Each structure stands twice: as C-alpha cells, then as structure tokens.
C-alpha cells in the first residue's frame, strides 16, 4: 500500500519541482539581463 502512494507523490512532485526550477532560473536570467542593460 505504501509503494503506490510513494510513486504517486513522486510523480506529483517531480513536474512541480522541474517547473519551479525552470521558473526560478528564468527569473534569475531575466533579472541579470535587465541588470546588464
């Protein structure tokens, strides 16, 4: 009963973590871009 729960949690968290990392990296890139200009 634990394995399906863990797999569900992982499957739910992985896309959220990836999107979070992409958003933070994009925001940092935009911030550095605006600071350079």
Curated annotation (Swiss-Prot):
The UniProt record lists the keyword NAD: no
SUPFAM superfamilies to which the protein is assigned, alphabetical: PetG subunit of the cytochrome b6f complex
Pfam family, one: PetG
Molecular function (Gene Ontology), one example: electron transporter, transferring electrons within cytochrome b6/f complex of photosystem II activity
Domain of life of the source: Eukaryota
Any single GO CC term annotated in Swiss-Prot or TrEMBL for this entry: cytochrome b6f complex
Subcellular location as annotated: Plastid, Chloroplast thylakoid membrane
UniProt keyword annotations, A-Z: Chloroplast, Electron transport, Membrane, Photosynthesis, Plastid, Thylakoid, Transmembrane, Transmembrane helix, Transport
Protein's membrane topology: Single-pass membrane protein
Regions that span the bilayer: 5-25
Biological processes, Gene Ontology terms: cytochrome complex assembly; photosynthesis
The keyword Endoplasmic reticulum belongs to this UniProt entry's keyword annotation: no
Subunit-structure text: The 4 large subunits of the cytochrome b6-f complex are cytochrome b6, subunit IV (17 kDa polypeptide, PetD), cytochrome f and the Rieske protein, while the 4 small subunits are PetG, PetL, PetM and PetN. The complex functions as a dimer.
Membership in a protein family: Belongs to the PetG family.
Biological function: Component of the cytochrome b6-f complex, which mediates electron transfer between photosystem II (PSII) and photosystem I (PSI), cyclic electron flow around PSI, and state transitions. PetG is required for either the stability or assembly of the cytochrome b6-f complex.
Record protein name field: Cytochrome b6-f complex subunit 5
Species annotation: Tupiella akineta
Phylogenetic lineage: Eukaryota, Viridiplantae, Chlorophyta, Ulvophyceae, OUU clade
